Amino acid sequence: MSVNDPLGDMLTRIRNALMRNKRAVNTPASALRRRVLDVLKSEGYIRDYAEVEHASGLKEFEIELKYFEGDSVISEIKRISKPGRRVYSGVKDLPLVQNGLGIAILSTPKGVMSDSTARESNVGGEILCHVS
């Protein structure tokens, strides 16, 4: 199956798994997905992830979702910059997601990072998604 937006596909898989209260979800592996998962893990939105290689050579990430008292830690995960419409922001214009209770994940010249890390590094970039 051809996927035009691999990151959007991963976010949709996570969103669907959370709606069904799944413990884990699998998604094909890529470098960008790994960096986004690193940010989600460091910010406490997922428990962990591991790379699994199948006999056919296909690599996937198994993402362990995080729940607190039966509710998912992620209440909303939304793709912002899409292949058809890229959204960029300078460091002064970085959005506050739910007044600072959520995060924006950015792709910057210094790598993929959260909005708070981007402010500390004084760098802007492409806003990949919002998580709250």
UniProtKB/Swiss-Prot annotation:
One of the primary rRNA binding proteins, it binds directly to 16S rRNA central domain where it helps coordinate assembly of the platform of the 30S subunit. Pfam families: Ribosomal_S8. One of its GO terms (molecular function) is structural constituent of ribosome. Gene3D superfamilies: 3.30.1370.30, 3.30.1490.10. This is Small ribosomal subunit protein uS8. One of its GO terms (biological process) is translation. Belongs to the universal ribosomal protein uS8 family. Keywords: Ribonucleoprotein, Ribosomal protein, RNA-binding, rRNA-binding. GO terms for cellular component: ribonucleoprotein complex; ribosome. It comes from the Bacteria. The gene is rpsH. Part of the 30S ribosomal subunit. Contacts proteins S5 and S12.
